[in-house]
């Protein structure tokens, strides 16, 4: 018989279960899913956490002390064989597009398979389904991911802000990469592949002049083709971000990365109903969110209505003394 979240099926951890969490879409999606791991381990610290992710997002999880294994999702792979090798007792598929995950988990004999109720094959293969809708609820996406833990009674409440980790050598290299830039350093991402809105080049030129006049040293970290810094991989970019005193970025993967690295962040967001701060703002105490004035506009135009001077009080607030581990 099919079990659904609304049926309030109660499962329990016996201790030492191997849990595989699948999140095979964008960087930001993976980052807002980390509270699922944190919630499990806060109640059951002996659980063993594995992740199934894409190769482009896997570097985010390096050095994370709570992760036992990171496994790559590739095209055409034998997922059933992978699951038999890992031998998890639980598979949680947080993304709704990669429906092969749950069907392969069933073929591999995984006892508990939790997924969103999307796609007939996935619905039939899951043991527990999440039917709750994501849109128009006013809930943050991180809260939506915690819904997948309802069979264990671990859903609800505020999600723990995601955290990313760097090695001492990586932090040192990040400081070396930016040694030529006098502090306070203001790292800038002009746009992101997943950004809901971003200003034009002319807007950024005016904004950087204003930031410089206020004593900041702006440096463009991304996109790579517009940065004057040598090319770097994702871990190197994370280290450079950590070496900055603050980051300004449209809402995209880098914004969530900055918050998870505990770098003070000003996040620029648009007005689309499905991309509001309530749903997608990066999580963390050092995050300031700025939206452009209404009405809604195309992704690259509406943000130009925002006066760059509006950002200055946010940057001043982020300059207030705060503790940043490892810096």
Which stretches of residues belong to each language-model region?
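Catalytic machinery of carbohydrate-active enzymes
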Residues: 1-327
